[in-house]
């Protein structure tokens, strides 16, 4: 799905599967691969602007209250900024600072010129990374990162299989 027309590609594959009767039947369907490692796990854990862990909606007062109590903080009732809107908002000045960890959008984004323009538009940009990437050229501060092999945790793949990672 990590392609300038990835969404359209997945929709086209889904439409073709539906046309030939391969949706809603056992052993059939479309399973597009996600663009980055552990995207599924991050989404499951609430790393999206519209949901908390377990895909519980931030706009639901009862859900928000539950997480406020568990986390001991007051939470914003509004949906946050989607990842695809961050760089356009940096260009317009709506986002003034950015912290990127473990990603090289200058290389991985389909529109490099757009990303560079956005990074240059920021007042302050922090990058945490293992290596000096193309994106690092635009950072005000570069912090050292750690690789998956240097920490413990889990990855959740596209089929929702959780894999444990040990040092």
Language-model-derived ranges and their functions:
Residues 1-26, 32-167:
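Non-catalytic alpha/beta scaffold blocks inside enzyme catalytic domains
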């Amino acid at each position: 799905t990590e392609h300038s027309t990835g969404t359209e590609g997945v929709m086209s594959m889904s439409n073709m599967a539906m046309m030939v009767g391969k949706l809603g039947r056992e052993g059939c369907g479309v399973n597009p691969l996600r663009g980055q490692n552990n995207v599924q796990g991050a989404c499951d854990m609430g790393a999206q602007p519209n949901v908390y862990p377990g895909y519980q909606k931030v706009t639901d007062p009862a859900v928000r209250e539950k997480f406020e109590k568990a986390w001991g903080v007051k939470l914003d009732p509004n949906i946050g900024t989607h990842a695809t809107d961050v760089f356009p908002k940096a260009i317009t000045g709506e986002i003034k600072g950015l912290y990127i960890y473990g990603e090289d959008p200058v290389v991985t984004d389909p529109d490099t010129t757009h990303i560079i323009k956005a990074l240059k538009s920021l007042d302050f940009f922090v990058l945490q990374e293992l290596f000096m990437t193309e994106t690092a050229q635009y950072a005000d501060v570069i912090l050292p990162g750690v690789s998956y092999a240097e920490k413990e945790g889990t990855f959740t793949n596209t089929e929702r299989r959780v894999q444990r990672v040990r040092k």
